[in-house]
Amino acid sequence: INTQVIANAPVKYLWAGIGDTMAKFYECTTSARGDGDELDHSTSMGVQISNLCAKPLVKYGVEALEECKNHRPGKALEEVILGIIVSTGFVSNLVGIDLNTGLAHACYNGFTVCRSTEEHGHLHGEIVAYCILILLKVDHQEDEFKKIYEFSKNMGFPVKLADIHATLDD
């Protein structure tokens, strides 16, 4: 992967890609729970790999954005790119349709019909990043919610409805 090409691309796409990629871990792991059936080998491997769709992004995300803004790829940008492209690619191919999406993307789909959200041209990953917070609250993952809430603030991701221009009237 030529990290310089990505470092020269608009930062907003890397930013949104981070938000979307992180959902892969949270949706995959929550969807895999409680099915009653034992997961087959490929699916289990995909669920385990999904950790690499979030952990490196949380660790390196802010620094990777800086490297991209400065058009100087380094370790942080490389780790984030690998999470977005390689880890997500493996997980998507290993876990099957039932674990490839979940509450964060369902909420995203709901926000796409909100006129106020649509009018402001929010990127897919931007709204999905907010919807990860919804998923964590609904799933009662309070410690993880706090961690991802702080990460989201540091990344400039939305952390409240007003940040995506959604209103109760929508």
Feature map (PLM): residue ranges:
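Proline-rich low-complexity regions
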Residues: 3, 83-86, 158
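A short secondary-structure junction motif
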Residues: 25, 29-33, 64, 87, ...
